[in-house]
Amino acid sequence: MSKRDFLLEIGLEELPARFVSDGEKQLADKVESFLKEQRISFEQISSFSTPRRLAVLVIGLAEKQADVEEESRGPAKKIALDESGNWTKAAQGFARGQGVSVDDLYIQEVKGTEYIFAKKFVAGQETASLLPELKELITSLHFPKNMRWHTYSLRYARPIQWLVALYGQEVIPFEITGVAAGLETAGHRFLGENVTIDEPTLYKEKLLQQYVMADSEERKKAIRHQIQSIMEEKDWVIPIDEDLLDEVTNLVEYPTALFGRFDEAFLSLPNEVLITSMREHQRYFPVKNQAGELLPYFVTIRNGDHRHLENIVKGNEKVLRARLSDAAFFYGEDQKLNIDEANKRLDQIVYHEELGSIGDKIKRVKVLAASIAEKLGVTSQTLQAINRVAEICKFDLVTQMVGEFPELQGRMGEVYAEIAGEPPEVAKGIVEHYLPRFAGDQSPSSVQGTVVSLADKLDTIAACFGIGLIPTGSQDPYALRRQAAGVVQILLDHELDLDVDELLLETVEQLQEKELLTVPESEVVKQLREFFALRVKTKLQDEGVRYDLTDAVLASGISNVPVVFKKAKLLVSKVNTPEFKELVEGLSRVTNIAGKAEKNVAINPDLFEKEEERVLYEAYVQTKDLVQGALASGDVSAAYAALEQTIEPIHQYFEHVMVMVDEQVIKENRLALMHAFAGVIGSYANFQEIVFK
């Protein structure tokens, strides 16, 4: 089959950097899906992007759709044939609709009913006649924010400036917002010119001649290499923030790295202030010496070549000087602010219109933190530090520095607390109570940071649930999933013996006492338990625990999160052992039949008729104490070993004892034993969830 290469490019006004990579991926995915749906074969798809363009190159695109033979089902046989075996009007109409003769109809059985079928040959259409449909594909791309321009109804990330749609040497005709597809693309805005693409595979080469590196990965690689060259030349260390690298890659079409300098006096500012000023406001990379100390230099990436670099350097230095001067002013002014006075201002800052001020939240966090500290049995000195951290952990929200750089909240609190003479453990707790900030971030290392972090996150989550602000689908404006995942991570990292159910109930009760709930208390607690169970489930699956083993351990509850994970990991280590299946089958048999038991029926050993009943009862009594004690101390191996010892008594019991006998008293007594034993088993896991292939 004949093939041609195909190029599709959308030329735009400058896209925000965060739109570019996703836009490129969307376009490539949609083009690939379109070609597959249309049965048009191809050899390879490549994608390209810059701030001014999104493009796809398809190599070896067939000139025709694949031919296909389609099978269509018609009416049931009893409707299609009359009593004489002749085709009815229904059958004849079906044949006409399919474009075949009634002689070509045939009968097949589907789920016990016979139907008539027809096969028809559908010849593939010319690819060139189908490609104009890509217009709808282009307009279907979605972005975080869209705009309209002129009088067009289309809402899009930025106005479309040009379109290239070239199949071999044939332009595919279509138009969007008055822009017709053609052969001409734009080079670099200042260094290049418009250029005609007369062959799809020459796209990258022709753009490079016009100072555009169309391949985003090649741009990123070039930036990394240029930074590395500066490092080697100057004997510097330039930490490459991957997020910043991605951003600058999508800000430029032709990258050139350069470095500049700032006044050494600014090095008196905290490192985080300097780095944040450079990274967040200017997209600069900070520079360090081999000892890891910040130097008064920066590296930035210009969108252009090496011409007139000295002017570019001076301009960047001037802008950074203004930024750092502002930061130095904020830093000086903030130190004039008394911490307790700053804290009082939080009473005037609304946390949420239905939940009061940030000051109100701090009061709740302080109560909850004290309760958690008591459960952990901390010393009086540590409790004092926890109380102070909880009391002032948000004071830096009123500082000018955090107002300018919100991402420095907590860190500036630590710095200002140290300057104000707060104990080191209190200052550390302030910054740590925000941890972990994101997936993969570290947990608080100090007790005070850990306790206040848990209290703060639990209050935030419960308060939002209490007024109906529950994450749905991809919508989670208050980052409640992330905060719940942070709670789970802290509990795991420090193996904290804290009852999650108890903590959730206590948090909600405090909100109820403050009359802040708009959802019934019992409903809030139920929703929170389900929410946290899902976070634990996600974490288990992220760590490679099989879905059925995950469901098995979650069925026993999540009150002690570290124990849940230990149980799951132990099951993972046992699942492929020969005796595991026998264990699961035996324990599941007990659990299964226990479902038939009446509630609250006591076991009466005097009603046992067979030795196997007495043996199993003794095994139950012994196992109950062993399993409960082992799980309470977190020794899941001992709990599992105790369950293993019951397999032989269980096997012998079911071999010689009939549970569902006619005599009601005996049956109820035997079911009572099953029910009690199932409770012990269920405290470890629901083994019925485990699947064997």
From Swiss-Prot:
<keyword id="KW-0067">ATP-binding</keyword>
<dbReference type="GO" id="GO:0006426">
    <property type="term" value="P:glycyl-tRNA aminoacylation"/>
</dbReference>
<dbReference type="GO" id="GO:0006420">
    <property type="term" value="P:arginyl-tRNA aminoacylation"/>
</dbReference>
<keyword id="KW-0030">Aminoacyl-tRNA synthetase</keyword>
<keyword id="KW-0436">Ligase</keyword>
<comment type="subunit">
    <text>Tetramer of two alpha and two beta subunits.</text>
</comment>
<dbReference type="GO" id="GO:0005829">
    <property type="term" value="C:cytosol"/>
</dbReference>
<dbReference type="InterPro" id="IPR006194">
    <property type="entry name" value="Gly-tRNA-synth_heterodimer"/>
</dbReference>
<dbReference type="GO" id="GO:0004820">
    <property type="term" value="F:glycine-tRNA ligase activity"/>
</dbReference>
<protein>
    <recommendedName>
        <fullName>Glycine--tRNA ligase beta subunit</fullName>
        <ecNumber>6.1.1.14</ecNumber>
    </recommendedName>
</protein>
<comment type="similarity">
    <text>Belongs to the class-II aminoacyl-tRNA synthetase family.</text>
</comment>
<dbReference type="InterPro" id="IPR015944">
    <property type="entry name" value="Gly-tRNA-synth_bsu"/>
</dbReference>
<dbReference type="Pfam" id="PF02092">
    <property type="entry name" value="tRNA_synt_2f"/>
</dbReference>
<dbReference type="InterPro" id="IPR008909">
    <property type="entry name" value="DALR_anticod-bd"/>
</dbReference>
<keyword id="KW-0963">Cytoplasm</keyword>
<keyword id="KW-0648">Protein biosynthesis</keyword>
<dbReference type="Pfam" id="PF05746">
    <property type="entry name" value="DALR_1"/>
</dbReference>
<keyword id="KW-0547">Nucleotide-binding</keyword>
<dbReference type="GO" id="GO:0004814">
    <property type="term" value="F:arginine-tRNA ligase activity"/>
</dbReference>
<dbReference type="GO" id="GO:0005524">
    <property type="term" value="F:ATP binding"/>
</dbReference>
